[in-house]
Amino acid sequence: ETPTSGDVVFHGDSVVDKKVNAAAYRAKVGMVFQSFNLFNNMSVLENCIIGQTKVLKRNKEEAKEKAMQYLTKVGMNPYINAKPRQLSGGQKQRVAIARALAMEPEILLFDEPTSALDPEMVGEVLEVMRGLANEGMTMLVVTHEMAFARDVSNHVVYMADGVICEEGSPSDIFENPQNARTKDFLARFRA
């Protein structure tokens, strides 16, 4: 989608600017979607290799090595030959995270990574994300997992109806919100 207003700045450059090579920036940004977006006709391993060979032009052996490294990191290496239909939602999301990591991005964008999961699967995905945060991975996470956001983030933006209501440190937002809409939302969260 093309933004209708505002700007997206990465490394000091406007990504929205028509003169900027958006494809070059996309190669530095990993995305993990709520619906996983895995290729159903490919194995777990193939899902983690294809982007590397097509976008980064890595040879297949190097791509396989990277894929195995990140599948191991998220605990999915025993499932390399499985197809997505054979996996639980939490397993699919961990494969999606491994696929994004195999591209070795500078930042990972997560769009509601736990919203499509059964409650018992949420924890395993959040644990992987918590590990990434502890390792210093820059992440932009859209989430309703408030405890996770409070514990892991260093900057929180609360939005409602597409508008930023308030932003600040986790302690600013969760312990001393200033905006009425933020206060109302957090009161329901604490209830």
Predicted regions mapped to residue ranges:
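C-terminal boundary and immediately downstream tail of ABC-type ATPase nucleotide-binding domains
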Residues: A160, E167, S171-A191
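ABC family nucleotide-binding domain
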Residues: E1-P170
